[in-house]
Amino acid sequence: EDDAEVLDAIQSMVANTQADGFILLYSKKDCPVAAYLRSEGLLHVIVGKAAQSANQTIYIDNDNALAGEEATDYLYEMGHRRIAYFGVSNAMLFSAERKRGYQMSLLKHGITPREGDCVEIDTLNDSYEPALKALLTAPGRPTAVLVSDDILAVVLEQFCSKLGLRIPKDLSIVSFNNSLFSRITNPPLTT
C-alpha cells in the first residue's frame, strides 16, 4: 500500500470511530500518515525513530547506526575490505541510520566510503538490477554486502545466483531482522 491508501484507511477508521490509536510499523521522512495523526492529536506510536517532531512523538527504536556499524565491523573482522551497501532509500530512517553506521565503520577502519558502493532503491519495483550488476561485476568488486533488511537480502541473493555468484564463497551477505526470509534461503542469511 502507498501512503495515500494508508492515509485514506486511517481517516476512514477515525471518521467511523473504529480505532482508539494507531501503531505505525515504519518511520519515514515527510510521512503524510504520521503528519495527519499528529495534526489531529490522535494517539499513535511509531516503530522506528520519529522522522519529525521526535520530542512530541512516542516511538520505539533500536540504535540502527550502531547496528550498521557493528555488522560492518563483523565483515571487516572476517577479512573483507571492499564492503558494499544495498538498502532502501534514505527516506526510510532505519536504512539511512544503518548506512550511516556502515560508513562510520569503514572510516574507523581507514576505508573511504565510496558512493558507487551503495545501491539504494525506493521500492522493489525500481530498476535496481543495472546498478547491482555494475557493482557486482566490476573489477575489484565487493567481497561482502551489508543489506538494510532481510527482504532485500533475499533479492540480492537471487540476483547473485543469476550472475553466477555463490553465497558465501564469492560474496558474503549480512542483513538485519532475522526474519523468516533469512532462514528460507540457501544458504541461510547471516542476520
Model regions and ranges:
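Bacterial carbohydrate/catabolite-sensing allosteric modules
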Residues: 36-46, 50-191
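Short N-terminal targeting/anchoring amphipathic segment
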Residues: 22-25, 146-147
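A composition-driven signal for long, intrinsically disordered, charge-rich low-complexity tracts
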Residues: 10-11, 15, 22, 180
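Short low-complexity stretches enriched in small and charged residues
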Residues: 1-4, 14-16, 39-42
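Short beta->alpha connector loops
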Residues: 2-5, 25-31, 151
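Structural motif corresponding to alpha-helix initiation and N-cap regions
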Residues: 7-8, 30-31, 125, 129
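Amphipathic helical "hinge" segments at domain boundaries
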Residues: 1-10, 21, 103, 107
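Short acidic/histidine-rich motifs immediately flanking catalytic phosphotransfer sites
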Residues: 15-21, 139-143
